[in-house]
Amino acid sequence: MPKMKTHSGAKKRFKLTGSGKVKRQQANRRHYLEHKSSRLTRRLAGDQIVSTPGEAKAIKRMLGK
């Protein structure tokens, strides 16, 4: 049986941590930053862990893990 292909969009957006959690970047930090406060842009700088177990499971399946 052939191997499953990795979802290209998912592999660009998500990374797995050593413990198996799914890491993602936060939204709203790509453009139009001029009118956003420095406080907001700093807060959006860090990565987040995907909190919903169902979503994390679906992402892992797309990544082939």
Swiss-Prot record:
SUPFAM superfamilies: L35p-like. Transmembrane segments: none annotated. InterPro entries: Ribosomal_bL35, Ribosomal_bL35-like, Ribosomal_bL35_CS, Ribosomal_bL35_sf. GO terms for biological process: translation. Residues 1-29 are annotated as: Disordered. Keywords: Ribonucleoprotein, Ribosomal protein. One of its GO terms (molecular function) is structural constituent of ribosome. GO terms for cellular component: cytosolic large ribosomal subunit. The keyword Cell cycle does not apply. NCBIfam families: rpmI_bact (TIGR00001). Belongs to the bacterial ribosomal protein bL35 family. This is Large ribosomal subunit protein bL35.
